Amino acid sequence: MSHIIELPEMLANQIAAGEVIERPASVVKELVENAIDAGSSQIIIEIEEAGLKKVQITDNGHGIAHDEVELALRRHATSKIKNQADLFRIRTLGFRGEALPSIASVSVLTLLTAVDGASHGTKLVARGGEVEEVIPATSPVGTKVCVEDLFFNTPARLKYMKSQQAELSHIIDIVNRLGLAHPEISFSLISDGKEMTRTAGTGQLRQAIAGIYGLVSAKKMIEIENSDLDFEISGFVSLPELTRANRNYISLFINGRYIKNFLLNRAILDGFGSKLMVGRFPLAVIHIHIDPYLADVNVHPTKQEVRISKEKELMTLVSEAIANSLKEQTLIPDALENLAKSTVRNREKVDQTILPLKENTLYYEKTEPSRPSQTEVADYQVELTDEGQDLTLFAKETLDRLTKPAKLHFAERKPANYDQLDHPELDLASIDKAYDKLEREEASSFPELEFFGQMHGTYLFAQGRDGLYIIDQHAAQERVKYEEYRESIGNVDQSQQQLLVPYIFEFPADDALRLKERMPLLEEVGVFLAEYGENQFILREHPIWMAEEEIESGIYEMCDMLLLTKEVSIKKYRAELAIMMSCKRSIKANHRIDDHSARQLLYQLSQCDNPYNCPHGRPVLVHFTKSDMEKMFRRIQENHTSLRELGKY
C-alpha cells in the first residue's frame, strides 16, 4: 500500500515546470513578462542555439532587493498580488510566482540584479532548483537573468524539442507579440550574435508594426477604435488587399496581455464582412482595455486563455470598430502604386470581343493556333509618404538598404481574385489521392467540335457529329493550364529567365526562418530565392513557365503554401502548386471571349490527356446527343408509340 507524502519542493517545481516551461520560448515569455512588470523601458533578449544552450534577458526595471533574491526562487513567492481581492483585479502579466522557480528547476540559472539606491547588487546561482550561491556583486539598476543548459535534468523533454530553426521561430513569435503588446518598450532579440527583431519603444503602435511586419505592411493598415462603459478598443487592421493565408497574423491583447480567443477572431472577420477574400485573413493588432474585474486570467498556467465577462458585447464592439473604419476608406487598391508596372499592361488589355477577327474555319485545325505574346517590363520604386515619416530609424535604414545599392523591385503581396474563382477552396487533404489519379491519366480521343456561341460569359456551345456540347470555360482552361504546369514545374534545367530588375520579397522573421529550412522545395520547382538583408530574399531569375506579371503574386502564393505545409513531398508540393496556379490563372465566369479565343481553347482542351475533368474532378463539358434533343422537344416518343395510337387523332 502506497502512503501519501508531501513532495519535496524541487520535485514539485519540476512538475510545475512541465506546465509552465514547455520549450525555450516559454522561458523567454515568462522572463520578459517579469521584466515588463518591473517597469522596464528596454529589454534585450540574447539566445544561443535557439535557447537550449542559453537564454539571457537584460532589463532596466526596478530590480530585486538583496534580501528578496533568494525568496524569488521559492514557489508562489510574488510581488504582484497580496490578497484574494488582488486575484480578481490582476493588472500585471505575472502573479502566480511559479515561473522563476520552474525555470530554475530545469536549468542552470544565474540572476544578477540591483535596485536604485543600493550600495551593491546581488548575484544568485542555482542549478536544478538548488541555490548554490548568493553573493554581492556590481550591477546596474535592473535585472539580468541567464538560463543555461535548459532541460539538462529532464532528458525526456529535450527529446521532444524540434529543430533549432523551429524553436527559434517560436521565440521570435513570442517577442513579436510582446513588442506589439507594449510599443512603449524597446525590445531587441539577438540569436547567436545576430539581431532578429528590434522595436523602437516610442509608444507608437504603427512603428512597432513596421519594425515587425515591415514598412509596406504598416502603411497598409488602418486605425480602429471603439468604446463603451466597459471596454476600450484600439489598434490597427490591414486593408482587405493585404491578407495572409492563416490567422497567425491576428494579435489580440487584453490589458497588454496576448491572448487567444476564437470568438474575438470571429468578430474580427465579421467586421470585414464580404470584403475579405475566401480563405484569406487580415493582419490585425487589437488592444482591448478592460476593467480587470471583468477578465479572469487565472485559468491556465500559460495565461493565454482568458475568460471575459460580457463577451458578446465585446465582440460587437470589435466588429463595429473594424466595419466603421473600413467604411471611411477607399477600398479600391491604389492604382498609383502600380502605375509604372501597369502602364504597358493596361494599354494592351483590350476587350477581346471587339478585335476584328477573320475566322471562317468551321472546325479547328490540327495545328495549334498562334497565340499573341505580351512583354511587360515595369519598375517599381518604394517611396516614403508623409504617413511614413514618423516610422522608426530601423525601418528607414532597411528601406535605404533596399533602394540605394541597385535598382530593385520591392515585391508586394497582391490579393488573388478569390471572389471570382469558380473553385476558391482547395481540399489539400485529398491532394495525394488526386495527384496519383491525375498522373495515371492517358490521352483519350476527343470529338471534333464546332464552336458557335457563348452564354453568360461562362459557357461555350459547340456541336459535334453526335450532338451538342456545353463547355465550362473556366474548368476547360483550368485543365489546360494544369497539364501545362504539371509538365513545366520542376523542370529546372534550361528553364530560367534572368530578370532585368530583381525582386525583393520580405517576410516576418519567423516565416523567413522556416522558409530557409524549406528552400530546397522551392528550388525543386525552379524558384531560387537568395537571402538579401534581414528577413528578405532576392529573386534574380524566374522559371520560364511563370509570366513576369505573375512573379510577385506567384512567389508569395508558393511561399504561403510552403509555410502552411509542414511536411510535404516534392511530388505533393508540385501537385498542389500546379492545381493552385491553374485555378487562379484561368479565365473566370462572366468573362466574354471572342470566337478565335474560344476555338483556341477547344483546340488546347483536345490536346489534354484528360479533357473531361478539371483538376478538382468537376466536369469540363456535358454532351446532349441528337436523340436527347429530340426527346426533349417530343420529336420522338421513347416507346415509339404514334399519336394516332394514343388516340390524339
Curated annotation (Swiss-Prot):
Bilayer-crossing regions: none
CDD domains: HATPase_MutL-MLH-PMS-like (cd16926), MutL_Trans (cd00782)
Biological process according to GO: mismatch repair
Any Gene Ontology CC annotation: mismatch repair complex
Keyword terms, alphabetized: DNA damage, DNA repair
Pfam families cross-referenced by the UniProt entry: DNA_mis_repair, HATPase_c_3, MutL_C
GO molecular function terms listed in the Swiss-Prot or TrEMBL record: ATP binding; ATP hydrolysis activity; ATP-dependent DNA damage sensor activity; mismatched DNA binding
InterPro entries, sorted: DNA_mismatch_repair_CS (IPR014762), DNA_mismatch_repair_MutL (IPR020667), DNA_mismatch_S5_2-like (IPR013507), HATPase_C_sf (IPR036890), MutL/Mlh/PMS (IPR002099), MutL/Mlh/Pms-like (IPR038973), MutL_C (IPR014790), MutL_C_dimsub (IPR042120)
Keyword DNA repair: yes
Superkingdom of the source species: Bacteria
Gene3D superfamilies: 3.30.230.10, Histidine kinase-like ATPase, C-terminal domain, MutL, C-terminal domain, dimerisation subdomain, MutL, C-terminal domain, regulatory subdomain
Family per similarity comment: Belongs to the DNA mismatch repair MutL/HexB family.
Task of the protein: This protein is involved in the repair of mismatches in DNA. It is required for dam-dependent methyl-directed DNA mismatch repair. May act as a 'molecular matchmaker', a protein that promotes the formation of a stable complex between two or more DNA-binding proteins in an ATP-dependent manner without itself being part of a final effector complex.
Protein name: DNA mismatch repair protein MutL
